[in-house]
């Protein structure tokens, strides 16, 4: 293969030692065999990889945390995977309340590092998700009602474009790229290498909670939760998880940036429902709050494959929607399957839908569901039940979260991005007119008028 540009960084071609390990993602259900993996150590390695790929007509997939929930999005047959997971510098500026992080950092590492320094970094429900992917897709989590989405806190970025050129974006320079990078999804505009976020002073202590009920009480708990969650105090983040009938239960957990006494009072409309089997509500130092909520979620030892789908609720689920949920939960078998809800509103809804690329600001709550399996022969039926459930719930939800993608969604652009999709296509046409960065659900460039 003749080329002007040499690959740099840690380079692993198909057939090299370490290739199979490089292929592994959080979801082990991958059947793709890239030509080469480049584990970039610095921004120049990323630029060289893009130039090499262009010179050799090789398709590109960027990869940050290996946490993509769909096959085909971070790997491609015969292509180059530009993996930035070794780029892990973190630089906190306490005086200005900002932090610069390289894109290889995982969310848990950043949140824990900053908590020790007395600052809040927003996070989701898994510590092993890469900061790149979660930021570019919006970045939801239990702190969003108090300080906004992860992407709402993004001030500046560094990206390598389709020509291998390093560009920066902030409110004064390439502002359209900054706008698109705050919810427009990864793998669309270039390979990102650095992010600058505003950070917030952490409280010395905060309250965490985890309440568990038997599975057969999920309907009454959900009805109470969805009535209460959208309008509760903005400082309270709440996640509700409902496992499969076979071996599952109901768990509500989250945090309140305030006292235990006040948390108990705020939680009562839900904790008084049914007969909880376990109830933990405790005041902790903020560093321990982060550890409590970010349980280990290793990437390379996952056994279960998954199919996910997601949406944003227009209003509380009526009985018909809950009946469809029950049918799903009675038929899925994997222990990691189920429904997950996150309360909305607060700081998320105070940002206008077109102010950033993340459009779905006015929902009542966020919902996702997934099936899980080990044996590849069970994949088809598990994928089918998730997508059939989406059809049943379609009347009650809008959109879908790009970080929890579903390749069963047709004409996915408006579903992920709402009315922001046309503008995102124009940004794509400006920064990647040749559609070098693409995947089965990426944003195509707008056609020239």
Short names for language-model regions:
Residues 1-449:
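Soluble FAD-dependent oxygen oxidases
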